[in-house]
């Protein structure tokens, strides 16, 4: 329920006991003399034991002498508590009151209450058969006088007998009014055909799949117990559980209503059909708050959609910070992978992926747009591996963390989705000799690299090689952006995830977008060392977008296994690198595995320590850094020596003076 405050308007003919019901509700006693109309009364949440009750409930008494005020209150109501007490006031329910609501355009749930059932209450009390438990709702009735109204007016959700004089069902009537808002039956159950509605069925099926931890198609006793604790914060009663299973077995036996269904299998548990039938029975018997208790625990709203605030929580991300998975997030995705890898072959095949994403809208659009699963590591059967699975979620979180939080909830993450994420520190810049450069990075595990270069220079082959795939001679120009993501390990055992992006026809728009460049940790400038026209593209790119020099750069001479050509450019690659004070190009070939590994490690190290490959930071700057540190050390040494000398001199002087 999204409402924190609901408004109950009590109406009905004069003399039916509206004011007495409200007074009895608030004072817990019958008051014989009252004013005609009570002012609005606010009842706090602690009046009810339900954890889904609203923070405040306003009960509004009405009179019939001022129709304008009555109409105004009805239009501002959330639920109508319609009271009658005898045959005449009963007749006016259909002829007057329901017609008034419709003429006003008031399409609200109505709780019909027959007050002044004093004689019946006295009889039940004298016979000792009146249920004294105020929390029981079995006193809700559907005898002959209610059936025509329930059939004719879909707005009437439930009916109840009450007596303000004997404090009978007053609290229950109030609770029923609250429940029409907190736990509405209309979204769940179609009373005309006696079936759960399609959206309700979908939601309950998802709950079943998420609760079926061993994925055997049954909810066993342990799984039901865990579901009960999650939804209602209490353990299930063993006898009650057995009664539910016996009921399902009974109604699915031959010649019974569900004889064509398997609802419960002894020794295994309740089936998905059994779970749906159970919740249908709850709705039929007016116990749909139980179903809502289950759905609320899985973050469903009144429209049977998952709460957007839960799916996409608002997170304040400082400028130049990035979002990564936390250890808790990685643990969840590891567990999810292992749970659905039924054949334990280390990969998720199509059937396993179908089961895994059954509780979601399907594969994330981001994955589909980036050629899933071939943007990351797959096995020989083209099934995504655990390594690729984690790399993919690392990339997804980096590019759009809201997709990750959304799927965390869809897949059954039972904590705040923000707990599965962590935000890196804002990237800092330093300045030396008038040149800005990025400070070293210590807390990032996911790094982003843009690969730039002339067409047919070998960038796509490099992406494939990054994922351990063999070289292909076939050439296909890159139109749409391509992306690859994989993990790699540096010296010391630290693991990182590197995202390589080939921009295709989006290259110019992305390079013109400073925000997109802020997301880039390192530029990989590629040229074909066997094509004399290739390097000039890199030079013109840097001339056009001069601010690219602010990013760490790695030059790469691809196709190094072919004959090296002199570049037809006013400056050669090594000279250009010297001019920018960065390393000479790495000579790489997709057929030389060792050179590839060297490149990917180099890209990662440069992203972590940008000063080593930022244009314009020449040896003088680095020397100044060293000289500066040496100066600090020298000054510290002098100060330390002077302090020691002074201390020693004072000790000698003090000793001499005492002598």
UniProtKB/Swiss-Prot annotation:
Q: Which residues bind GTP 1?
A: 12-19, 61-63, 115-118
One family from Pfam that matches here is EF_assoc_1
- SUPFAM superfamilies annotated for this entry? EF-hand, P-loop containing nucleoside triphosphate hydrolases
Q: Where are the transmembrane segments?
A: 632-652
InterPro entries hit by this protein: EF-hand-dom_pair, EF_Hand_1_Ca_BS, EF_hand_assoc_1, EF_hand_assoc_2, EF_hand_dom, Miro, MIRO_dom, P-loop_NTPase
Chain ranges on the Mitochondrial intermembrane side, renumbered to this chain: 653-659
Tell me which residues make up the Miro domain: 3-183, 444-609
- Its predominant location is mitochondrion
Which segments constitute the EF-hand domain?
Answer: 199-234, 328-363
EC nos: 3.6.5.-
Q: Does the keyword Hydrolase apply?
A: yes
Annotated membrane topology is:
Single-pass type IV membrane protein
CDD domains given for it? Answer: Miro2
Q: Name one GO cellular component term.
A: mitochondrial outer membrane
Where along the chain is Ca(2+) 1 bound? 212, 214, 216, 223
Keywords on this record? Calcium, GTP-binding, Hydrolase, Membrane, Metal-binding, Mitochondrion, Mitochondrion outer membrane, Nucleotide-binding, Repeat, Transmembrane, Transmembrane helix
> What's its job?
Mitochondrial GTPase involved in mitochondrial trafficking. Probably involved in control of anterograde transport of mitochondria and their subcellular distribution.
The similarity comment for this entry is: Belongs to the mitochondrial Rho GTPase family.
Q: What is this protein called?
A: Mitochondrial Rho GTPase 1
Source organism: Kluyveromyces lactis (strain ATCC 8585 / CBS 2359 / DSM 70799 / NBRC 1267 / NRRL Y-1140 / WM37)
- Lineage, opening ranks: Eukaryota, Fungi, Dikarya, Ascomycota, Saccharomycotina
